[in-house]
Amino acid sequence: GRARAIETGELHIDVAFIAAPTCDKYGNINGVQGKSACGSLGYAMPDAEYAEQVVAVTDGLVSVPLEYVSIPQTQVDYIVEVESIGDPSGIATGSIRISKNPAELVISKYVAEVIKYAGLLKEGIIFQFGSGGIAISAAGFVQTEMQRTGIKAAAGIGGASGFLTEMLANGYIGTFFDPQDFDTKAIESLYFNSRHHEISASAYANPFSANPYVNLLDVAVLSATEVDINFNVNVLTDSYGKLIGAPGGHPDAAAGAEAVSYTHLRD
């Protein structure tokens, strides 16, 4: 919704300050290099394109033009160099792994079985798995079934984790379209794997675009805090009203995918 609002002019941005892990002296930006690498800058792309003025704030200023460009110099008005744009340890080191919690593994197995027996796990499937331990574990069970049957996914869409990018590297996923990254393995994949593509938040889920990527999804597996018997989903609070989560691509995936499976939010 936000990307749509920016592009239609409903949300006007006077100045966009964009954290740039790497920026050359001409204003080209990427998020896959530098000490503060964060991966895809998909959610900053609409801001850079439509803001009246764009300021790149970087702790990785380089003198030569960047080979990998997420946001081009034509959209950047000013560059500000600072000592640090943030703490990269806030991004999971390595890759988010399959859960070892027995209860979560049971739920993950059920999720994978639902996907299988609903007839969704077929050659050319397009899927999205969230960053929670259960979602990643479900992806692991799905991969096991893919190994058994020889099924290959046409594409993965949405936030990228190390586990999903390993599936990409090993040929279980044909290509990946990525508006954000969850761990350092995913960041490395985006930089080095030519089948791993950075996309904007608008390309991912703008309902006003001709065909947002979420509309291609066969199935999405995401985290939730509560789900009632009528399939209404809460991703913000626990049963006592305490904020413990946030909606990411949940509404978008729910609108676009053929089927959505929600798991409980990882602590």
Predicted regions and their residues:
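Ligand-binding beta-strand-loop-alpha-helix segment within the catalytic cores
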Residues: 1-23, 153, 160-226
